[in-house]
Each structure stands twice: as structure tokens, then as C-alpha cells.
Curated annotation (Swiss-Prot):
This is Nucleoprotein. GO terms for cellular component: helical viral capsid; host cell; host cell nucleus; ribonucleoprotein complex; viral nucleocapsid. It is found in: Virion; Host nucleus. Residues 8-21 have a biased composition (Basic and acidic residues). Its main location: virion. The gene is NP.
Amino acid sequence: MASQGTKRSYEQMETDGERQNATEIRASVGKMIDGIGRFYIQMCTELKLSDYEGRLIQNSLTIERMVLSAFDERRNRYLEEHPSAGKDPKKTGGPIYKRVDGRWMRELVLYDKEEIRRIWRQANNGDDATAGLTHMMIWHSNLNDTTYQRTRALVRTGMDPRMCSLMQGSTLPRRSGAAGAAVKGIGTMVMELIRMIKRGINDRNFWRGENGRKTRSAYERMCNILKGKFQTAAQRAMMDQVRESRNPGNAEIEDLIFSARSALILRGSVAHKSCLPACVYGPAVSSGYDFEKEGYSLVGIDPFKLLQNSQVYSLIRPNENPAHKSQLVWMACHSAAFEDLRLLSFIRGTKVSPRGKLSTRGVQIASNENMDNMESSTLELRSRYWAIRTRSGGNTNQQRASAGQISVQPTFSVQRNLPFEKSTVMAAFTGNTEGRTSDMRAEIIRMMEGAKPEEVSFRGRGVFELSDEKATNPIVPSFDMSNEGSYFFGDNAEEYDN
């Protein structure tokens, strides 16, 4: 990528860093992890959780959500100005699961947000530690990406459900900052922009007045983020057109959908980070591991090593398969919802199946679910190999893909050819090539038609043995090409509902 030199690495975004060298970055990411771990330990003490209960992923999610809610200033202000019955704007809480007399019980806890903020700051040497908060948001986002297929959201904005591989980060809150923007897929950015344009079409005052100026600058900023994710001049030029439009409307929506479709073959750069649940960091810190001193990276071997030595449990519903639940969480931990399943199976060392074949629902348990028959089991989050996370889309070529998901967005920098269903993608590009963007459209279509199936992405890159910490001996995997490569294949995953 040409502009790579001007970009901060995503560890710097993660830690609000000015330019830092690799050692400083590893230390500041480590410091962030330490803070999350210390906070988690303190919360387990407050809630009187046993070691086992503290390693339960459902408890981890509740505790993470509590601190995110305590620091959500806009929502907190909104709640205070619009009081609703039975909701105390100053309190936050959720379900905590405890083992009582040999069975799992749900207990709803409620805390002052002020108290949670105090505990969080204390764990983070008095700072607000926004990087740590964003880290937890990205973990939740990765878990959503693995659990739900956002068909409805795609259809509502006029996009095609088969474009789900572009939807990474679609449930990230707006306040997730630069680190959040880095992990958003092309489709996510396009969807945010289309929603904005639609509001402008329906509400005459949306772009006007004092507020309209802020709206406009947010619009242009989002266009620039999206432009920065594209890797070809024509796609970027198209984003300039959309950004400079005097009065964004249907023409811009058309252009955005066109550019999103094109990203199925001419993939954008989307960052991937392994963000783990707080219940992994807590026990590691309490066992005396010093992340800041040792250094930590979200994109190298560190998360793999940490998961190799972690014990995490999950509640399991009566008809769920614990191995499938493990796969779901493993994929979320490595931000791998849209990666090629054949590569994931190779790295994990066990077969990774498409979402529709998994007998498991989401990790969170709804408040109306019956606890009587809940069991718990260990999540198997270990891997056979490790690989470096990528922030590029890899170059492009084609291969048979599926009815559900017709392209992948690579997570790991490992040599392979990237599957996508060229005939299906190209079929969407007949017709409209007139208008302001016609030359760019023609150029983009020409590049897509030139994409070759035998081209290899990430040439020479491989996976590594877990003993190979310095990544000296890459192992280039070989794949069974007859296997299905897409996770959301002709899928029946539940929809994501806020």
C-alpha cells in the first residue's frame, strides 16, 4: 500500500500512541492488557466469584459490558435527559452466573456507574484508559461477526446478503475511535454512509445549520476512512466523488454500493486483531505475568500463546455442542469470521465448519432462558500453528465459492488463493456505467475481469509452529480445494438484534 508509511500501526491507534518503536508499542499494548486484567480481578473480588466463575465467558461479557456502559458518555447523558421507567441512568449491571448446590444460577447485579469507573481507573493507574475500552469493544464486535450474519442490515441498505464478508465491525459503537475504524470492513463503512445519506434525503435539515456542518464533516471523514481502505486508484477516485458531492443522494448511494460490490474482488485493507475476553487477561495477570514488562502484540504470536495456557469456560444450553461453541469463540478471538475455513482448519488443527453446520447459538444467555438444564464446559481455544494477522486484503483471484458468502476477507497473512465466485460477483455489474463515475466504473470492472484464479496471495508467507516465536520457519499450507471455504455458507445463522 503506497501510503503505508504515513499510517500509524494499529497498535499505535490501539494505545493512542505518537510514533513509537516496536518495543515501546509492545510495552504500551501490554500496559493496556494489564489494566484490563487488573480491572477484571477486582470485579471478580467485588462480585465474590470463585476462580471457575471468574473464568466463565458469560460473566466476562457482563463485566465488560458494565464498564463500557459506565464510560458511554453520550448514552449516559441521553438517559439522564430522557428518564425511562424502571431504568436508573446512574446504574449499570447484568446477569452474573454462579454455581450454587451443583447447579448454575443467574443473579442480576446492579452497580453505580461511578463505582465501576472508579475501579476501572484504579486498575489503570488513574487513567480513563480508552484504549482498553476500545479493545473490549473490538472483542465484542468480533464475537458478533462470528455469531450473526447481518442479512437484514445489508438488505435494508440496498446491499446483497452475499456481501457479508465485507461487514467486519458492523456492530462497533461509533465511539470506538481510530482503532475501531481500522477494523471496519468496506461494507460496514458503506452501510454507515448510506444510512447517513438516507437521513439527508428524508430530513431537509440534516445537512443544514450548525449541526449540519458537524454532520458534513463526519460524512467527509467517513468517506476518507473508506477511501483509505481501497487499494486501487479507481476505487479511491470514486470515493473522492462521493465525498465532494454537494448534496449527497441516490447517485452517491449507487456509487457506494458499486464500490462495495467491487471490494468482493478488489479487496480493501481491513485490520485484524486478536482481542480476547477479559477473563483471559485477568487470570494471567493474577498469576504474576507482567504484560507491560514482557510486551504484547495483538497481531503476532502473543494471543496464541496466551490462549494456549488459558482455561475459559462457557455455559452450554441443553442441545448445543461444546466443540461448536469452542469454534465460535476461537474464531472471534482471532477476528476470523470472514477468513477462508480451509486455512482456519489448518491453523487450528481441527476442522472448522461453516456457521450453518454448528449446533450452537450465541454465547450470551438471554434473561428469559431457563437455567435449570444449563451445563458448563471448557472452551477449547488452543491452536496447532500461529500466523501473523494481516491488514491488507491480499491480492485477488477466483475460485468456486458458495451460495451464501461469495468472497473472503483474509485475517492471516498466509500464502493461498482467495476464493470468490467471479461469475456471481460480475453478474451484478451489468448495466449502469453512465454518469459522473462512468470512467471509474469501467476501469474497476476491467480490473475485476482481469482477476485470475491461479494468482496466489501473500506469496511466501506461511504459518509457524508455536515454538517458533521469532517466525523464522514459515510453513506454507496445502489445501484441499474441494472443500468449502466460506463460513456463512447458504446460512441460517441468527440475525443480530441490538
